[in-house]
A protein has these predicted regions:
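Active-site proximal loop and beta-alpha junction motif in alpha/beta enzyme cores
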Residues: 1-220
Length: 220
């Protein structure tokens, strides 16, 4: 492994209420252990998580987000996870400043939906149709497939498919940025069950921002 084991935390983001399910996240707390682009991308590919975060300044929340195949300016799941791990109120990924807070059970970040530029959503007639989709469905480009489970209550069933030729992730268990995009499109708070059972909460915030939250735990 490129980074020393002691420098790597693995945490579970967007857990269900009983602690099961989640999207795992690798966090390298000292980014100096992987000082260049090649070493960071190699470690992200080796770990194989949907994202790995390298912390370059823990006090200012400066972070570098990598999938197994590319660098990302913004991603929701890793920022919720690293906000919980570092216990700070502001993060600074390449996209811009992200505010964070905790309420005891959930960790929340507030972000701009226009930062989500590489994904599209597609509504299906029922949760059963979403569940029946192959992984991945035919086609190219990042797809967030969703259906109402209970529209009045804002409950959504969703699955996320990166469909990137350079990415080893066939299906993303919990996708914060796509949940932000869907919330902006629908203009309402949502309670999303994604993947095998991960839970994502969202809500519109002032000035066109979107707040997204979930439970975070250490893995193992």
């Amino acid at each position: 492994m490129n980074a020393r084991v002691n420098d790597l935390d693995v945490i579970k983001v967007f857990c269900a209420g009983d602690g099961r399910f989640c999207n795992p996240l690798g966090v390298v707390r000292d980014g100096r252990t992987c000082p260049d682009d090649a070493s960071r991308q190699a470690l992200a590919a080796e770990l194989g998580y949907s994202e790995t975060v390298f912390v370059d300044d823990p006090e200012r929340g400066v972070v570098d987000i990598r999938t197994p195949g590319t660098r990302m300016a913004f991603a929701g799941h890793p920022l919720v996870g690293v906000a919980w791990l570092l216990d700070i109120e502001e993060l600074n990924p390449p996209a811009g400043s992200v505010w964070a807070r905790g309420d005891g059970e959930f960790t929340w970040i507030t972000a701009r939906p226009e930062w989500v530029t590489d994904k599209r959503t597609e509504q299906y007639a029922s949760a059963a149709e979403v569940d029946a989709l192959p992984a991945p469905p035919p086609g190219e480009g990042w797809l967030y497939a969703w259906a109402w489970e209970d529209e009045a209550a804002g409950r959504v069933r969703a699955r996320g498919f990166p469909r990137r030729p350079d990415d080893a992730v066939t299906e993303d268990e919990a996708t914060g940025s796509a949940a932000i995009l869907l919330t902006e499109q629908l203009g309402r708070a949502l309670n999303i069950t994604q993947g095998a059972g991960s839970q994502i909460l969202t809500a519109p915030a002032p000035d066109g921002m979107i707040e997204i939250g979930g439970r975070v735990r250490f893995a193992g």
